[in-house]
Amino acid sequence: MPETDFEEKMILIRRTARMQAGGRRFRFGALVVVGDRQGRVGLGFGKAPEVPLAVQKAGYYARRNMVEVPLQNGTIPHEIEVEFGASKIVLKPAAPGTGVIAGAVPRAILELAGVTDILTKELGSRNPINIAYATMEALRQLRTKADVERLRKGEAHAQAQG
Protein backbone atom coordinates (compact mmCIF):
# COMPACT_ATOMS: atom_id res chain seq x y z
CA MET A 1 0.00 0.00 0.00
CA PRO A 2 1.48 3.38 -0.99
CA GLU A 3 2.41 5.78 1.80
CA THR A 4 0.06 8.44 0.35
CA ASP A 5 -3.06 6.44 1.30
CA PHE A 6 -2.47 7.34 4.94
CA GLU A 7 -4.03 10.31 6.67
CA GLU A 8 -1.86 12.03 9.28
CA LYS A 9 -3.09 13.73 12.46
CA MET A 10 -0.98 15.56 15.02
CA ILE A 11 -2.00 14.76 18.59
CA LEU A 12 0.54 16.75 20.58
CA ILE A 13 3.52 19.05 20.31
CA ARG A 14 5.59 19.71 23.38
CA ARG A 15 8.59 21.91 24.00
CA THR A 16 11.40 20.92 26.34
CA ALA A 17 14.29 23.14 27.36
CA ARG A 18 17.86 22.55 28.47
CA MET A 19 20.13 25.19 29.93
CA GLN A 20 23.32 26.30 28.19
CA ALA A 21 25.68 29.06 29.23
CA GLY A 22 23.87 31.44 26.85
CA GLY A 23 20.34 30.58 28.06
CA ARG A 24 17.68 28.02 27.23
CA ARG A 25 17.91 25.73 24.19
CA PHE A 26 14.61 24.24 23.08
CA ARG A 27 13.72 20.92 21.50
CA PHE A 28 10.31 19.77 20.33
CA GLY A 29 8.49 16.48 20.59
CA ALA A 30 5.56 15.62 18.31
CA LEU A 31 3.06 12.77 18.68
CA VAL A 32 1.52 11.84 15.32
CA VAL A 33 -1.03 9.19 14.34
CA VAL A 34 -1.37 7.89 10.77
CA GLY A 35 -4.14 5.67 9.43
CA ASP A 36 -6.06 4.62 6.34
CA ARG A 37 -9.52 4.57 8.03
CA GLN A 38 -9.80 0.91 6.97
CA GLY A 39 -8.24 -0.91 9.90
CA ARG A 40 -4.59 0.19 9.74
CA VAL A 41 -3.21 2.75 12.18
CA GLY A 42 0.21 3.74 13.52
CA LEU A 43 1.57 6.02 16.24
CA GLY A 44 4.93 7.78 16.32
CA PHE A 45 6.74 10.18 18.65
CA GLY A 46 9.45 12.27 16.98
CA LYS A 47 11.89 14.69 18.63
CA ALA A 48 13.95 17.39 16.90
CA PRO A 49 15.27 20.95 17.34
CA GLU A 50 12.44 22.32 15.12
CA VAL A 51 8.70 21.53 15.07
CA PRO A 52 8.40 20.54 11.36
CA LEU A 53 11.32 18.10 11.72
CA ALA A 54 9.77 16.56 14.84
CA VAL A 55 6.42 16.11 13.04
CA GLN A 56 8.15 14.59 9.99
CA LYS A 57 10.07 12.12 12.20
CA ALA A 58 6.92 11.23 14.13
CA GLY A 59 5.10 10.48 10.85
CA TYR A 60 7.99 8.27 9.75
CA TYR A 61 7.99 6.36 13.06
CA ALA A 62 4.18 6.03 12.93
CA ARG A 63 4.36 4.40 9.47
CA ARG A 64 6.94 1.92 10.81
CA ASN A 65 4.74 1.07 13.81
CA MET A 66 1.44 0.07 12.18
CA VAL A 67 -1.29 -2.05 13.77
CA GLU A 68 -4.00 -4.01 11.95
CA VAL A 69 -7.35 -3.44 13.74
CA PRO A 70 -9.96 -6.21 13.35
CA LEU A 71 -13.07 -4.10 12.66
CA GLN A 72 -16.58 -5.58 12.77
CA ASN A 73 -19.37 -3.33 11.46
CA GLY A 74 -17.37 -0.21 12.32
CA THR A 75 -16.65 -1.26 15.91
CA ILE A 76 -14.24 -3.55 17.77
CA PRO A 77 -14.88 -7.28 18.38
CA HIS A 78 -14.80 -7.18 22.20
CA GLU A 79 -14.27 -4.98 25.26
CA ILE A 80 -10.66 -4.43 26.31
CA GLU A 81 -8.86 -2.72 29.19
CA VAL A 82 -5.17 -1.79 28.94
CA GLU A 83 -2.76 -0.05 31.29
CA PHE A 84 0.28 1.88 30.13
CA GLY A 85 2.24 3.47 32.95
CA ALA A 86 -0.29 5.11 35.27
CA SER A 87 -2.80 5.50 32.43
CA LYS A 88 -5.58 3.05 31.75
CA ILE A 89 -8.02 2.94 28.84
CA VAL A 90 -11.22 0.96 28.44
CA LEU A 91 -12.58 0.36 24.92
CA LYS A 92 -16.11 -1.06 24.48
CA PRO A 93 -17.84 -2.07 21.25
CA ALA A 94 -20.92 0.03 20.45
CA ALA A 95 -24.06 -0.36 18.34
CA PRO A 96 -24.16 1.26 14.88
CA GLY A 97 -25.06 4.96 15.11
CA THR A 98 -23.39 5.48 18.49
CA GLY A 99 -20.39 7.35 17.08
CA VAL A 100 -16.91 7.63 18.58
CA ILE A 101 -17.40 8.49 22.26
CA ALA A 102 -13.82 9.25 23.29
CA GLY A 103 -11.41 11.89 24.53
CA ALA A 104 -9.34 13.84 21.99
CA VAL A 105 -6.34 11.45 21.96
CA PRO A 106 -8.14 8.07 21.63
CA ARG A 107 -10.63 9.70 19.20
CA ALA A 108 -7.84 10.70 16.78
CA ILE A 109 -6.38 7.17 16.85
CA LEU A 110 -9.73 5.34 16.58
CA GLU A 111 -11.06 7.55 13.75
CA LEU A 112 -7.90 7.03 11.67
CA ALA A 113 -8.18 3.28 12.37
CA GLY A 114 -11.63 3.34 10.77
CA VAL A 115 -13.70 2.81 13.93
CA THR A 116 -17.10 4.54 13.61
CA ASP A 117 -18.88 3.31 16.77
CA ILE A 118 -17.13 2.83 20.12
CA LEU A 119 -17.30 3.77 23.80
CA THR A 120 -14.09 4.63 25.65
CA LYS A 121 -13.04 5.71 29.12
CA GLU A 122 -9.68 7.08 30.27
CA LEU A 123 -8.78 6.16 33.85
CA GLY A 124 -5.82 7.08 36.04
CA SER A 125 -3.29 9.47 34.52
CA ARG A 126 -4.65 11.43 31.55
CA ASN A 127 -1.14 12.05 30.14
CA PRO A 128 -1.76 12.22 26.36
CA ILE A 129 1.38 10.25 25.46
CA ASN A 130 0.55 7.36 27.83
CA ILE A 131 -3.13 7.38 26.78
CA ALA A 132 -2.05 7.20 23.12
CA TYR A 133 0.29 4.26 23.78
CA ALA A 134 -2.39 2.50 25.89
CA THR A 135 -4.94 2.93 23.06
CA MET A 136 -2.50 1.50 20.51
CA GLU A 137 -1.70 -1.45 22.79
CA ALA A 138 -5.45 -2.12 23.22
CA LEU A 139 -5.93 -2.14 19.43
CA ARG A 140 -2.89 -4.44 19.07
CA GLN A 141 -4.42 -6.95 21.55
CA LEU A 142 -7.84 -7.15 19.86
CA ARG A 143 -8.77 -10.57 18.46
CA THR A 144 -11.74 -11.69 16.37
CA LYS A 145 -13.76 -14.75 17.32
CA ALA A 146 -12.13 -16.62 14.41
CA ASP A 147 -8.63 -15.68 15.67
CA VAL A 148 -9.41 -17.04 19.15
CA GLU A 149 -10.90 -20.26 17.74
CA ARG A 150 -7.81 -20.77 15.57
CA LEU A 151 -5.48 -20.13 18.52
CA ARG A 152 -7.42 -22.48 20.82
CA LYS A 153 -7.53 -25.20 18.20
CA GLY A 154 -3.75 -24.92 17.94
CA GLU A 155 -3.45 -25.18 21.76
CA ALA A 156 -5.72 -28.25 21.90
CA HIS A 157 -3.67 -29.84 19.12
CA ALA A 158 -0.40 -29.06 20.94
CA GLN A 159 -1.76 -30.49 24.24
CA ALA A 160 -2.97 -33.68 22.52
CA GLN A 161 0.52 -34.27 21.11
CA GLY A 162 2.33 -33.33 24.34
Curated annotation (Swiss-Prot):
GO biological process assignments: translation
Pfam family name, one: Ribosomal_S5
Xref: InterPro entries: Ribosomal_Su5_D2-typ_SF, Ribosomal_uS5, Ribosomal_uS5_bac-type, Ribosomal_uS5_C, Ribosomal_uS5_N, Ribosomal_uS5_N_CS, Ribsml_uS5_D2-typ_fold_subgr
Gene3D superfamilies: 3.30.160.20, 3.30.230.10
SUPFAM superfamilies: dsRNA-binding domain-like, Ribosomal protein S5 domain 2-like
Function: With S4 and S12 plays an important role in translational accuracy. Located at the back of the 30S subunit body where it stabilizes the conformation of the head with respect to the body. Binds mRNA in the 70S ribosome, positioning it for translation.
Further facts: Is positioned such that it could physically interact with spectinomycin.
Domain characteristics, as noted in the entry: The N-terminal domain interacts with the head of the 30S subunit; the C-terminal domain interacts with the body and contacts protein S4. The interaction surface between S4 and S5 is involved in control of translational fidelity.
Protein name: Small ribosomal subunit protein uS5
Organism: Thermus thermophilus (strain ATCC 27634 / DSM 579 / HB8)
